[in-house]
Amino acid sequence: VKQRYLLLLLIAIGYIGGNFIVDRWEKTLYYGDSNGYYLHVVSFFVNQDVGDYDQTITTLRQVNPDSSDPREDVYGIRLTDKGQRYIKYTVGVPLMETPFFLLAHAYAKLTGQYPADGWSKPYLLAVGFAIIFYVLLGFYLLIGILQRYFSPQITALVVLSLAFATNLFFHATYVTMAHGFLFFDYCLLLYLTIRFYETPSTLRALGLGAVVGLITLTRVSEIVSALIPLLWGITSRETLRERIRFIGANLKYVVAAPVGFLLGFSLQFAYWYYVSGHLIFNPYEGEGFNFLKPNILRGWFDFANGWLIYTPIMAFSLLGWPLLRRYCRAPQLAILAFVGLHAYIHYSYYAWTYFPGLGSRPMVETYPLLAFGLAASYQYCSERKWLRGLPVIALVLFTVLNLFQTWQMRQGIIWSERGNRAFYLETLATLTPTLNSHRAYESNELQPDEADITLVKPLVQQGFEDTTLFATVADITHGGNYALYDTREFLPWKAELDLAEMHPRDWLKVGVSAYIREEDRLHERDKAAVLVVEIVDGNGKKKTWKCIRISPFIGNKAHHIWPTGEVNMWDEASFYVRLPRGLQPNWRANVFVWNAPGQKMILDDLYVELYRDR
């Protein structure tokens, strides 16, 4: 018991301190999914405008003008056929936020020191920290569960690993989305499942159904959580037969559990019916799933927010799953079925990188289940002298990595959901962004240290002086008499380079000078024109295709990945592309500007140079 409270105290200190260090609690509820969930609460309790949301959104934008208007977002607040507006996010998170909201609301009204509008500091503090309360409560339950099967030492290592070496920390300190709340829900489900099979009762069956309903109320796709109580304890054909006999002899439980589920999910039925006139309603229309092509491997291993790339300690959990037959057989089948189906559903979603997150966020709610595999892996190591120190080393190493990368996300050094291999390697262990990290982010090409390469020769210099070929301007130029001001998607020119005399692993440096007028200021970085290097073989087959957005480099002396470009100044956008190892004499390179969005920008002095390693 003493160890449990010491662990909880340590986690509480780390999470509360982390929340203040990350220092997003005053802004989190104003943006993104965190805002989408919280709008339910403010609308219901403060403005009573459910189904309209005008007053709620108006007050939001009055206190924080930078907040986007979800009515203007194609995937934001939309209209039903009934003419009511609806929020696509289900009401599980708002329900769990409500007690903390009401505390803040009472404080604001009683003291009169803050507006009782749902957006002032007491609300931001109380609701922003609610997720930490639920995570701590989840850990309280999980510690007790694990100690049934594993030693206090193994339990402590597992709990500290989940708390500080995984992206659960990010989701408890950086955002207030569903996943931290679901962590608690799943811990509660495990606790009730174990208690039910120890001493079955109608009340406990009702409770199990209600918790599955609450989990589904939080994210509808989490209905697969029903597999956990269904499959728990099935370890052989004989135990499967026993389970079937148990269900057949206790139909009252079969009735009670679905009744509990309907009670737990009833609030969502009520909301859907109110806004749409239907009990069953698809709020994610247009945001589809492709169940024929799930992206499980990419979701776990891609540098664009891949789960195990940014949360590598959980590889121990996967490796520990087979070992559960030795240490803890009861959850093994439930883990396999639940995690497998959970991953299949979530990585069939069209936006499988799941912005935002430091590592794929749908896996966070699976951690109460995956804790068993992690414990089995640690137990296996502890029984072998040559592996005994590995769990502690892993805990320390991956905690440092996780906390450091959380800080990097906060500083804008990394952006995991838009990451790539080159960007990951360029930013690993860096304290500030660099020009090369920005180039790598844009191009997914590792960039050379310029001290390690030497210029061989210039290859191309295009000043856009031919006014018969290009749309030009003469009043703003970088060099010469004219500069390019052409919004066509493709120019009637590209640099075509013969690569016959070049060596494999040589470098092409490609750059262009750019200028944005005040009236042409760009507000969305994904609508920027790009500078492209394309390498093709003798048959015209593409072998390499690399590009960078041009305007984010303008005036970006800090080399951050967020800017769209400063106005009224010239600057250069450039990057290096390495020629492939298998380079053949008949291959060629094409260099061109691709302006699919039709960005208005002045370009001048495009160049290509050949470099070679010293």
Regions found by a protein language model. Name each.
Residues 1-456:
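Membrane-proximal envelope and lipid/glycan-remodeling enzymes
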Residues 444-614:
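Extracellular and organelle-lumenal recognition/adhesion modules and their flexible linkers in secreted
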